[in-house]
């Protein structure tokens, strides 16, 4: 039975330590992932949790939620530890998603010390929860791209979009404006902010470039609806009665 420790905004190492008893099997830390607590906060580091677990002969687990192999802070996002960095901190087991920031198919991934992975493989739930062959094939193809970070940034859509420079975004916006120039639109290119989305990096924004569209007869709401109904739906947003295409 899981035992919650600490409070919503502050958790100390002593909260974990005081909750350990004869029935304790593991210490778990869960990433907030799709929300962020600001202000008067405190959390326990991975190093502290792994040390306390070793001292009490327990397993340390970190559920990273999204999980990532690339440090996105160099592209303007707040620093978040990569899967490798969490493992290097001494955590025994790390869990994360195959999609979201990793950019692969929807799946749950468990990595960590071999002795614990082997025990999980023998659990009767493994067969029930295992992914299908198509998911495995897609995940393998995605992970192979990470052998070369440049390849991953170029060919994995999520990573490619996060890492695009502002200059490249302006180039894309100019191309789109040119293609739409013969239509009955007022077209404006502007700088803006964009969210990563997918339940990752809450309250964080990327520098972005957008194309704003206004039509003399159709409202922004009507334009948005029509673009969603085409064969390949186009996702837009509305701001100040303008239709926004984010690059």
Where are these regions (language model features)?
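Homeobox/homeodomain signature
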Residues: 92, 110, 119-121, 149-152, ...
């Amino acid at each position: 039975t899981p035992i919650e420790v600490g409070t919503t905004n502050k958790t100390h190492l002593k909260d974990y330590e005081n909750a350990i008893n004869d029935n304790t099997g593991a210490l778990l830390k869960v990433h907030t992932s799709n929300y962020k607590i600001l202000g008067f906060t405190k959390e326990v580091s991975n190093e502290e949790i792994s040390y306390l677990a070793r001292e009490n002969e327990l397993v340390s687990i970190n559920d990273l939620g999204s999980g990532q192999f690339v440090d996105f802070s160099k592209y303007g996002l707040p620093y978040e530890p990569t899967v490798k960095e969490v493992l290097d901190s001494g955590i025994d087991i790390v869990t994360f998603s195959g999609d979201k920031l990793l950019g692969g198919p929807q799946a749950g991934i468990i990595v960590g010390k071999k002795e614990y992975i082997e025990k999980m493989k023998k659990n009767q739930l493994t067969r029930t929860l295992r992914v299908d062959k198509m998911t495995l094939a897609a995940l393998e193809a995605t992970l192979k791209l990470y052998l070369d970070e440049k390849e991953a940034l170029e060919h994995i859509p999520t990573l490619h979009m996060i890492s695009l420079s502002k200059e490249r975004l302006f180039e894309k916006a100019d191309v789109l404006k040119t293609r739409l120039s013969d239509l009955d639109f007022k077209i404006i290119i502007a700088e803006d902010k964009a969210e990563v989305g997918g339940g990752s990096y809450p309250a964080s924004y990327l520098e972005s470039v957008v194309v704003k569209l206004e039509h003399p007869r159709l409202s922004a709401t009507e334009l948005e609806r029509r673009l969603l109904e085409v064969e390949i739906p186009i996702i837009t947003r509305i701001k100040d009665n303008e239709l926004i295409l984010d690059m």
